[in-house]
């Protein structure tokens, strides 16, 4: 039914709950998980701003900014490692993707590139608003995705 599943995570508690549901899909024929983390464009822009300010004091601006982005990407990769191990232990083939940009846009881009049959996503992410039933990223992905979306309630 769902051979390839996209699992975008922002490392929130709700994303962790989604992982539990995701592992159960192996019994429904799921074989491959595309594990995605998006480094939000706001974070990249913040690095840019910080390093532009530092540029006037230090000529190594470009190296420092690139180094900061690499370090951030490696930190995300390290946070994904236990999730990869857990999914592999559950019998899945795992592809790891770390993208930079706006979460909704990147999730939909990866959905298309990896030809996924379903997306498993938490209803609320890191920036959850008290009382809201669904987060803005989850809501937009649910509306715009071409594949089935399993929205996991927190």
What do the predicted segments below correspond to?
Residues 56-75:
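A short acidic, glycine-rich active-site loop
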Residues 118-143:
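Glycine-rich, Arg-bearing micro-motifs that act as flexible, cationic patches
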Residues 37, 123-124, 154:
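Short secondary-structure boundary segments
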Residues 1-62:
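Small/aliphatic-rich secondary-structure junction motif
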Residues 147-154:
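Short, flexible loop segments at boundaries between secondary-structure elements
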Residues 45-48, 108-109, 132:
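Short, well-ordered secondary-structure micro-motifs
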Residues 34, 95-99, 150:
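General small-molecule cofactor/ligand-binding pocket signal
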